[in-house]
Curated annotation (Swiss-Prot):
NCBIfam families: mraY
Pfam families linked: Glycos_transf_4 (PF00953), MraY_sig1 (PF10555)
Reaction catalysis annotation: UDP-N-acetyl-alpha-D-muramoyl-L-alanyl-gamma-D-glutamyl-meso-2,6-diaminopimeloyl-D-alanyl-D-alanine + di-trans,octa-cis-undecaprenyl phosphate = di-trans,octa-cis-undecaprenyl diphospho-N-acetyl-alpha-D-muramoyl-L-alanyl-D-glutamyl-meso-2,6-diaminopimeloyl-D-alanyl-D-alanine + UMP
Function of the molecule: Catalyzes the initial step of the lipid cycle reactions in the biosynthesis of the cell wall peptidoglycan: transfers peptidoglycan precursor phospho-MurNAc-pentapeptide from UDP-MurNAc-pentapeptide onto the lipid carrier undecaprenyl phosphate, yielding undecaprenyl-pyrophosphoryl-MurNAc-pentapeptide, known as lipid I.
Cellular localisation: Cell membrane
Annotated keywords: Cell cycle, Cell division, Cell membrane, Cell shape, Cell wall biogenesis/degradation, Magnesium, Membrane, Metal-binding, Peptidoglycan synthesis, Transferase, Transmembrane, Transmembrane helix
Domain of life according to the entry: Bacteria
GO biological process, one term: peptidoglycan biosynthetic process
Name of the protein in its database record: Phospho-N-acetylmuramoyl-pentapeptide-transferase
């Protein structure tokens, strides 16, 4: 029965995304919600200017509808589900505001870094307040073992750091057609398996709903993309995957399963540090996916390579937790 629920969930999430797209994409075009491409980016990206953005709305709507329907039909609404939806929608709304300012108000940078950071921290604080009052644990477990360390009052600081850092890391990965959609589907799929293994079926249903939603979106986001998810989608997905890691006590494993996001972020950090200290750049451009474009790789080759890396890291994460 539970296996059927998972199958129905991924199919429903996929179909809702696929069916929404032909309606929503022309609507975005009519509103002139087109992506602006930065001039310092790869020249090959200039032709993408004007491609509809804010498509993350479709992903979020699919996740909400699928999760609610499947939970009401086969399970019951749990606090885990409420927390997952809260963070996903909260970070999605923050991303929507950022996209809206960029696209409609023509402020290229959207929200300021300070404004975005405050929004991310506020959502993380509300999440942790509910998490804490539900008597949730403050320990972090070593993957593949029963060994854990209680961080006590430091844990909320770590939660805020993980949510802010994780959502931004996922956001940085959204730079090529289909790159984030594919890597997100893989990472959420891995966490769905691990949540299922823990008998946290509500979390597994949510994770599978995300897989279905992003795969449906990928149909229209694969190269050449007809729509971009924007910060609306990338921040929502980032917040969601970190929340899953916290609820399943797999915070450390997130670094492995979400390894592509971590590597992309490290490439930006290293690039900035190197340039500020030596005046030289390590990469031709950061995040890392742009470096490979500038050394001559096709966009599709970069995307497939990163998907493959994400899949290998996801398998490694599952192996460590389940079979090691």
């Amino acid at each position: 029965m539970l296996e059927q629920v998972i199958l129905f969930t991924i199919i429903m999430g996929f179909l809702i995304s696929v069916l929404l797209s032909p309606i929503f994409i022309p609507f975005l075009r009519r509103l002139k919600f087109g992506q602006s491409i930065r001039e310092e980016g790869p020249k090959s990206h200039q032709k993408k200017s004007g491609t509809p953005t804010m498509g993350g709305v479709m992903i979020i709507l699919s996740i909400i509808a699928t999760t609610i329907v499947m939970t009401m039909k086969f399970s019951e609404v749990s606090m885990n589900m409420i927390l997952l939806l809260f963070v996903t929608v909260g970070y999605g709304l923050l991303g929507f505001l950022d996209d809206y300012i960029k696209v409609v108000m023509k402020r290229n940078l959207g929200l300021t870094s300070k404004q975005k950071l405050i929004g991310q921290i506020v959502i993380a604080l509300v999440f942790y307040a509910v998490y804490h009052f539900q008597g949730m644990p403050t320990d972090i477990r070593i993957p593949g073992t029963e060994l854990s360390f209680d961080f006590g009052w430091i844990y909320p600081v770590l939660v805020i750091f993980m949510l802010v850092g994780g959502s931004n890391a996922v956001n940085l990965t959204d730079g090529l057609d289909g790159l984030l959609s594919g890597t997100a589907a893989i990472a959420f799929g891995a966490f769905a398996i691990l949540a299922w293994n823990q008998s946290q079926y509500d979390v597994a249903i949510f994770a599978v709903a995300v897989v279905g939603a992003v795969l449906g979106f990928l149909v229209f986001n694969a190269h050449p993309a007809k729509v971009f998810m924007g910060d609306t989608g990338s921040l929502a997905l980032g917040g969601a995957i970190v929340t899953i890691a916290i609820l399943t006590k797999l915070e450390i494993l997130l670094v492995i399963i979400g390894g592509v996001f971590v590597i992309e972020t490290l490439s930006v950090i290293l690039q900035v540090i190197s340039f500020k200290t030596t005046g030289k750049r390590i990469f031709k451009m950061s995040p890392l996916h742009h470096h490979y474009e500038l050394v001559g790789w096709s966009e599709w080759r970069v995307v497939v390579t990163f998907w493959t890396a994400g899949l290998l890291l996801a398998v490694l994460g599952i192996y460590i937790e389940v079979w090691l």
